[in-house]
Amino acid sequence: MIALTKPTLAPRSPPHGCVDRPKANDCDSCGARALSVCSSVADIDLVRLGDLAEVVKLSAGAVLTREGEPAPHVFNITSGSLRVYKLLPDGRRQITGFLFAGDFLGLAIGESYVFSAEAIETTTVCRFRKGPFRALVESSSPLEHMLLHRTSHELAAAQNQMLLLGRKTAIERLASFLLDLPGHDPARPTAPGHVRLPMKRGEIADYLGLTIETVSRVLTRMKAKGIISMPSQSDLIVERPDLLRAHASGEV
């Protein structure tokens, strides 16, 4: 689904129609297929799904959806990563999640988007109009079951996030985040213990309900204890997973 691409979108404009649609054989070669809802689709339905898909390429910082605007589409991420967030009336931002290849966006929305989504890095998504996509889902039991599973997973993740924000200390929050993140980025396999951090420190802070200074201070403390090392700003190595797990569970 990612062989054809669109021109990069302007950061303040939501994406509109693509000139071309991908062919079904692009779905067969899509690197994110095994990670996404597409993995449940039979060959005949995969052809139909490919016919519905529009491929959109986003540059870093480009807007995919904006909170409060009409929501005619759902999206399947095939490469890159997104930050999903809501804005408070005073302008403060709460990031509610980071999405990676294989994630599906827009399952539980109504007529308007209840969140904004922006690309953290160069990102490609397959975009589907909700009406035709729902019709396909209703005719494909495996796809329907997969989407139900994804929705249940999102609810469980939301409950875990409430616990993280409501009860955990700063070091417990960051340790939990570092343990959880690699499992959400399966399209980017790394060596054991390596964690890819495409997001900025401020974005991590907005996700964990902390300040940038607190995130930096906790990371420095973890490095001093030998729990982690950081070859670069976007690459972290967990040197002591046992201690990281202990901090995440509040045992230290």
Positions of PLM-derived features:
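Polybasic "coupling" helices that flank or enter modular domains
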Residues: 138-211
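Phosphate-/nucleic-acid-contacting segments
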Residues: 183-252
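Short aromatic/basic micro-patch
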Residues: 55, 74, 98, 127, ...
